[in-house]
Amino acid sequence: MGKMIIDLQIASADESGLPTAAQIEQWATAAVQPQSGEVEMTVRIVDETESHALNFNYRGKDHPTNVLSFPFECPDEVELPLLGDLVICRQVVEREAQEQEKPLIAHWAHMVVHGSLHLLGYDHIEDDEAEEMESLETQIMMGLGFVDPYLSEK
């Protein structure tokens, strides 16, 4: 099995209660399952102001969001092991965990897994795509020792 290299950037005013670099690496590795060599991605933990600005600029949505995924698009003739960037909003993740009555650490793990799958090209725009992605997320999360993240919706 290959190795995940995570460039963790903390751009949140409050760093307490955030997952560790080792946890984020474990969750991303479970989602990406690199086969050989090294695979790199950036995980940036931000506050609502930055999340809101990025969500507005790139998706036209006028509010912060839990996770944004920016896949690295490399020309075919160039081989670079870069997956892309995840931008995760601390306050949105904390609020959602509370609203959904989930352990905070489980929701952090889910956001890293969910975002990592987006970097691999998975999507949830169409119902069949959403079903496939949610099934894969559930499988990965349960493999990590967490409960089904969609349990409350079933």
Curated annotation (Swiss-Prot):
One of its GO terms (cellular component) is cytoplasm. It comes from the Bacteria. One of its GO terms (molecular function) is metalloendopeptidase activity. Its EC number is 3.1.-.-. InterPro entries: MetalPrtase_cat_dom_sf_prd (IPR023091), YbeY (IPR002036), YbeY_CS (IPR020549). Its cofactor is Zn(2+). Zn(2+) binds at residues 114, 118, 124. GO terms for biological process: rRNA processing. It is an enzyme of class 3 (hydrolase). It is found in: Cytoplasm. Binds 1 zinc ion. Keywords: Cytoplasm, Endonuclease, Hydrolase, Metal-binding, Nuclease, Ribosome biogenesis, rRNA processing, Zinc. Belongs to the endoribonuclease YbeY family. Single strand-specific metallo-endoribonuclease involved in late-stage 70S ribosome quality control and in maturation of the 3' terminus of the 16S rRNA. This is Endoribonuclease YbeY. The gene is ybeY.
